[in-house]
Amino acid sequence: MTQGETHVQTKARGSAGARSLLLTVLGEFVLPRGGEVWTGTLVTALGALGVEEKSARQALSRTAAEGLLGSARHGRRVRWSLSPAGDRLLREG
C-alpha cells in the first residue's frame, strides 16, 4: 500500500469517525439536557477526541443535512439542537 492510499483510507475513516463521535457527544451531553449548543463548543469537544476542526464542521453540516440537527444563527455564530428525528435516533439507539 502506498503512502497516498494510506492517507486516503485514514481520511475516509476520519470523516466517518467524526460523525460517530458527534452523535456520541450529542447523545451524552445534549440529549439529556436538551437545548442548543454553540458550534465552537461542539468543535472543541470533538477536537478533544482527536477530530480536526474541518472534519468536525463537516460532520455538523452533513448531520444537519440529514435532518438530525437544527441550527439557529445568532449574528455570526450558530447554535445547534437535535431535531425530532435526531432526538428519536439517539433515544432509540
Give the residues covered by each predicted segment:
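Short alpha-helical segments that sit at the start of domains
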Residues: M1-V25, R88
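Short helix->loop/beta-hairpin flanking segments within DNA-binding domains
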Residues: L23-E36
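Short, amphipathic alpha-helical interaction segments positioned at domain boundaries
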Residues: D87-G93
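Basic amphipathic alpha-helical segments that dock to polyanions
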Residues: A59-E66
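Short, Lys/Arg-rich nucleic-acid/phosphate-binding segment
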Residues: R73-R79
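Short acidic, hydrophobic short linear motifs in intrinsically disordered regions
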Residues: R33-A45
